From Swiss-Prot:
Residues 1-18 form the signal peptide. Nerve growth factor is important for the development and maintenance of the sympathetic and sensory nervous systems. It stimulates division and differentiation of sympathetic and embryonic sensory neurons as well as basal forebrain cholinergic neurons in the brain. Its relevance in the snake venom is not clear. However, it has been shown to inhibit metalloproteinase-dependent proteolysis of platelet glycoprotein Ib alpha, suggesting a metalloproteinase inhibition to prevent metalloprotease autodigestion and/or protection against prey proteases. This is Venom nerve growth factor. GO terms for biological process: cell surface receptor protein tyrosine kinase signaling pathway; modulation of chemical synaptic transmission; negative regulation of neuron apoptotic process; nerve development; nerve growth factor signaling pathway; neuron projection morphogenesis. One of its GO terms (molecular function) is nerve growth factor receptor binding. Homodimer; non-covalently linked. GO terms for cellular component: axon; dendrite; extracellular space; synaptic vesicle. Pfam families: NGF. PANTHER family: BETA-NERVE GROWTH FACTOR, NERVE GROWTH FACTOR NGF -RELATED. Expressed by the venom gland. It is found in: Secreted. InterPro entries: Cystine-knot_cytokine (IPR029034), Nerve_growth_factor-like (IPR020408), Nerve_growth_factor-rel (IPR002072), Venom_nerve_growth_factor (IPR020433). Residues 48-70 are annotated as: Disordered.
Amino acid sequence: MSMLCYTLIIAFLIGIWAAPKSEDNVSLGSPATPDISDTSCAKTHEALKTSQNTDQHSPAPKKAEDQEFGSAANIIVDPKLFQKRRFQSPRVLFSTQPPPLSRDEQSVEFLDNADSLNRNIRAKRGIHPVHNQGEFSVCDSVNVWVANKTTATDIKGNEVTVMVNVKP
């Protein structure tokens, strides 16, 4: 089982490593495609030079952490990542609202539609007695266990003899 797990993890890592890089998930240091214009690279290079020049004129000492994360300000985040999406599935209906906690605390929206009541509220099942307990054991008619009984009535109503010792 562990060998299968290791194999799947290695296959996953190889797949990620061999996947082609797109412009969306590429780090700043490695371009994804060779058609990136030199002007954009030159602009970022000039911006870095000017920021370094302004930093050199300031008398405040810089920490090593600030120098490492100085280029992190140029990261652009796609606004599509933060949009709320409604999930769709052919088999499951995803609701945009949480189900009500109890019948008394239901909101007016759920009470307006009878279909939503049927879909969201479940009826509790009644507790059924278990009928098959001890069906292979010997039991007297008054439900008292006896050890010295030699005959019994089976499920179909036939008289059967009870074996005292069972050989394995």
